From Swiss-Prot:
This is FAD synthase. It catalyses: FMN + ATP + H(+) = FAD + diphosphate. SUPFAM superfamilies: Nucleotidylyl transferase. Pathway: Cofactor biosynthesis; FAD biosynthesis; FAD from FMN: step 1/1. One of its GO terms (biological process) is FAD biosynthetic process. It holds the Pfam family CTP_transf_like.
Length: 152
């Protein structure tokens, strides 16, 4: 994807976004505040299964559609099955926002990998998400199991 000349700053972030919760929305609002265009890379089902040892609950295309429907998001795309850097190399972002628990890359490793491709985006780690009872998809699933599956 070529950069649109009218876009001043392209921001990207990536994640699974399996069961949407306030933490997801907070990072998306933050990411959008850093630029003019926010593109979100949605992890593929097979990638999530490989990294987390379990399939996402919501299929990848539905997750992409839901994220793209959120106000801060200009576009959501599916990530690559083969190379996690591929969409970043195509999008050529000015800023990359990493989530607080996103450990696929640390900032320095990502920076060095992108420099090999002559890309020099600013890399920002989002740290100040709103604390709330269910700020992770895993916590939501645990609560559902507790409330509905442990009944006699």
């Amino acid at each position: 994807m070529e950069k649109d000349r009218n876009v001043k700053k392209r921001v990207i972030t990536a994640g699974t976004f399996d069961i949407l919760h306030p933490g997801h929305y907070e990072i998306l609002k933050f990411a959008k505040s850093l630029g003019d265009e926010l593109i979100v890379i949605i992890a593929r089902d097979k990638t999530v299964e490989r990294l987390k040892g379990r399939k996402p609950i919501i299929p990848e295309n539905q997750r992409r559609e839901m994220v793209e429907a959120l106000k801060p998001v200009d576009k959501a795309i599916l990530g690559s099955l083969n190379n996690k850097l591929e969409p970043i190399l195509k999008l050529k972002p000015d800023i990359i926002v990493l989530g607080p628990d996103q450990m696929t890359f640390d900032e320095e490793t990502l920076k060095k990998e992108l420099e090999k491709h002559n890309l020099h985006p600013k890399i920002v780690r989002f740290k100040n998400y709103k604390k709330c009872p269910f700020h992770s998809s895993f916590d939501i699933v645990k609560e559902i199991v507790k409330r509905y599956c442990n009944k006699e």
